[in-house]
Amino acid sequence: MACENCYLKPTFEMKSLIVLMLSSLLNIASAQNTPVGIFQANSDIGNPKKAGSTIYNEGDQSYTMKGGGYNIWFERDEFHYLFNKIKGDFILTANFEFAGKGNNPHRKTGWMVRETTDEKSSHISATLHGSGLTVLQWRASSGAAMRDPQDEIFAKDSSFNVIQVERAGKNIIMRAAYTGKPLEMIGSHVMENLPDEVLVGPFICSHDSDTVEEVKVWNVRIDRPVADNYDPGKSGNLGCRMETMDVSDGKRIVIFEKTGRFEAPNWMPDNKKLLFNMDGSLFKIPVNGGEPEKLNTDFANNINNDHCISFDGKLLGISHSRQGMPGGGSSVYVLPLEGGVPKLITENTPSYLHGWAPDNKEVVYVAMRNGKTVYNIYRNSIEGGKEVALTDIKAGEHVDGCEYSPDGKYIYYNGHYSGTMQIWRIKPDGSGKEQLTFDNYNNWFPHISPDGKWMVIISFPPDIDPNSHPSYKRCMLRILPVNGGEPMVLAYLYGGQGTINVSSWSPDSKQIAFVSNSGK
């Protein structure tokens, strides 16, 4: 027989306490699954004793992550995770730096690709330890014990600054780099049990249940690569990001994103806006981001990515395609920088503008002439007259990206005469040809800083056609002295055509702007 006094009846106070506790738990769960920066969620995995957190710093678009956890090892894991759900192939790239010396040399951070948020989930992690140890580690299936060394690939070097992970089908590839250096292949592993949709993102684990460690993550990019034979004309363009970068530290800021295509920013002389081409027109956008504003170019509505601003900041040169003209009809025009009616400079086509003379009276461009099937470098007065050929290359060779130095002594360009595409310079009369880069990359589009000291180039992989600068490739932006020297990497990006076809230096020579492809 039941006893009516054998249990306590809930009081109003008890109900209020229960509601408060449930509300607190819901708030914690909600906070952990709130989007942070470009990520959909952040959460502790495996219920670590010390809770983790992530703060997104909007000013520099970096992430400060804190996390505890005994380890990411054996049959289960404890750590803090910042992640997105993604299907298909991807490329993950970021800089990582631990805060302070830390309490355990085995604290770890990096990129993780994970099946679920379950503590026993299968995963593969590109890991940087507090000691500098850099390793690719994995759990092949849910609940399996991670083994040393069977489930690891160790890097020969240590203490890398940049970590990259790429998925190509079932294969997971890890690369890493020191600041200013190209990415190195660390290793790869086929993860047969990972589904098409996975979680991807950076993580932090203290390797000590009673401790919380901290890491800063910046230049975070998630790119969606396409097949090498992808044709944007047939299959559509990938999304784009407009980025700016401080060349002294390589920190990048995304100021504008779009699902369609835009290209080739110029930094405006007032240091307040960028100019870029999109959908056949030119647009201005504040350097800190905002809504693009269309520039008046009158009839010119088929403008490509070859446009540049005169040294005195008064005139704008564009390449606009005229319908029905040979070779696609690209022609060089000049108009006021504030907008207006373009004036035709090159009657013959095709002609692609790349630079101005420092006296603001001439332009330099590449063109096909006299029935030849190769491009050569030409200069011409903006007042008209006979154009002057500066190169005379052979069939199969290629030159492009011609640009004056601010002192007017040289014209820099990229040229393929044998082997890979490299950077060269000539004098304004075409004499004194001099090679400046000598590596295995295909180097394009030299852009000289306004102070005349530095050159930024885009470097394509060795395996592409040297005469081609295609879209959607794994590229680098690199910087070197104008007289030559070892290039230093500024950025690892997915891009190519339209990334930095024309000069995008800021007037103070401290920043550049460029376009990367997001895959959106």
Task: Locate each region found by the language model.
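Beta-strand C-termini and the immediately following turn/loop, strongest in propeller blades
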Residues: 230-236, 256, 269, 274-280, ...
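Blade/loop signatures of beta-propeller domains
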Residues: 228-248
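Multi-bladed beta-propeller domains
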Residues: 244-261, 287-303, 335-350, 380-398, ...
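Short loop/turn segments that connect beta-strands within the blades of beta-propeller domains
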Residues: 168, 238, 270, 278-279, ...
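Structural motif
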Residues: 239-241, 281-283, 326-333, 373-378, ...
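Bacterial Sec-dependent N-terminal signal peptides
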Residues: 1-33
